[in-house]
Amino acid sequence: VLIGSSLGGFYATQLVAKYGVPAVLINPAMRPWQLFHGLFGGELPYVVNAQWTLDQTQLDQLEQMAVPFVQDADKILVLLQQDDEVLDYREAQRYYSNAAHQSMIMTEANGNHAMDNFADKIPMALQFLSDCIK
């Protein structure tokens, strides 16, 4: 079972594609290599913090990891908020709804990248995951 937010949602998607495990994704990043490049103004390497410096090699690795579609997309619950200040929620809507077995997608008006009122969504997420592993 996986739960991933933003970049963690991108990584979780790769693991669902590879292992078929269920996941809950919170405002997942769709193309993080482009996102990071845009956020940091193309200035690489970028020192994120004392332990992490982002460079072009890492961005290239992220791009190589991307999967064109997820076969087991029905094992994914996607939680999106339209006022995400970092990501365009419509990219995730398109990606996760284009699979043969569509993901369950919940899109809310307003909100933000950190997912407003996430605690209210925990019971639904747990029920979804429980149904997936039965």
Model-inferred region functions:
Residues 15-19:
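Aromatic pocket-lining residues of Rossmann-like dinucleotide-binding sites
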Residues 22-133:
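The alpha/beta-hydrolase serine catalytic core
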